[in-house]
Amino acid sequence: MKNKELNLHTLYTQHNRESWSGFGGHLSIAVSEEEAKAVEGLNDYLSVEEVETIYIPLVRLLHLHVKSAAERNKHVNVFLKHPHSAKIPFIIGIAGSVAVGKSTTARILQKLLSRLPDRPKVSLITTDGFLFPTAELKKKNMMSRKGFPESYDVKALLEFLNDLKSGKDSVKAPVYSHLTYDREEGVFEVVEQADIVIIEGINVLQSPTLEDDRENPRIFVSDFFDFSIYVDAEESRIFTWYLERFRLLRETAFQNPDSYFHKFKDLSDQEADEMAASIWESVNRPNLYENILPTKFRSDLILRKGDGHKVEEVLVRRV
């Protein structure tokens, strides 16, 4: 039987907003409206009500997993007679389409997790920094494939994750500028002795094909994750959010002379919409269906969004 014929929804328990909100229990983490807006992505939506209804229960669930992993590691280290083993961070992966709101989810989780009673140190890394530099992509004639799996320096990303899980004291990741549409040369995000590391990116749940495994057996990014989240929505909604974001960028970031897209600052509304639609159809939509959406059911939890970026349903994997 082909995977597409399987009803993979049965792997998950499904919860609407009302039932999910009840799983927050007695966990209380204060977040102001200003703080919620500060982590909100461009054209995204995050209110205190959304934090309390969706993210507090999620943080409680994540905390259970973090504590369970720490307890398991402690017992395994005793068994192996390594009582003073290096500190190993709990890694959370967050995947989903362009414009679906992954960054907002990642940032609010970082803030909330860091405010748990035991005050864990939480770092956030986006995989954008592991895109090959623009000059290299141009040299390989791959600019139209930017965001597709082959446009990432996967070897460097795997080395970064391997260093984290090996207990290395200090690990650094390259930083990406959405203004210049390129890596920031010589700029790095340093992760030092973190308790939790969040890895956010469109393709982080992708696995090698069977052909890849036969020819070159290897591990992939998701093999380093202790918990994974997929931010989901209907394509029509995601496209609408992408279109709205493109319009906002034209009015803001594109006006900056340093912006890679400065040449598009004077586009009319119709021209901007046509360009956004063209990019969506030629790049983002194919990437969604070829590489991102097929990984949804590899996640431990799915946040399904509806109108206005509000999460309508939460799916939690049973096994």
Curated annotation (Swiss-Prot):
<keyword id="KW-0418">Kinase</keyword>
<comment type="similarity">
    <text>Belongs to the prokaryotic pantothenate kinase family.</text>
</comment>
<dbReference type="GO" id="GO:0005737">
    <property type="term" value="C:cytoplasm"/>
</dbReference>
<dbReference type="GO" id="GO:0004594">
    <property type="term" value="F:pantothenate kinase activity"/>
</dbReference>
<comment type="pathway">
    <text>Cofactor biosynthesis; coenzyme A biosynthesis; CoA from (R)-pantothenate: step 1/5.</text>
</comment>
<dbReference type="GO" id="GO:0005524">
    <property type="term" value="F:ATP binding"/>
</dbReference>
<keyword id="KW-0173">Coenzyme A biosynthesis</keyword>
<keyword id="KW-0808">Transferase</keyword>
<dbReference type="Pfam" id="PF00485">
    <property type="entry name" value="PRK"/>
</dbReference>
<dbReference type="GO" id="GO:0015937">
    <property type="term" value="P:coenzyme A biosynthetic process"/>
</dbReference>
<keyword id="KW-0963">Cytoplasm</keyword>
<dbReference type="InterPro" id="IPR004566">
    <property type="entry name" value="PanK"/>
</dbReference>
<feature type="binding site">
    <location>
        <begin position="96"/>
        <end position="103"/>
    </location>
    <ligand>
        <name>ATP</name>
    </ligand>
</feature>
<dbReference type="InterPro" id="IPR027417">
    <property type="entry name" value="P-loop_NTPase"/>
</dbReference>
<keyword id="KW-0067">ATP-binding</keyword>
<dbReference type="InterPro" id="IPR006083">
    <property type="entry name" value="PRK/URK"/>
</dbReference>
<keyword id="KW-0547">Nucleotide-binding</keyword>
<protein>
    <recommendedName>
        <fullName>Pantothenate kinase</fullName>
        <ecNumber>2.7.1.33</ecNumber>
    </recommendedName>
</protein>
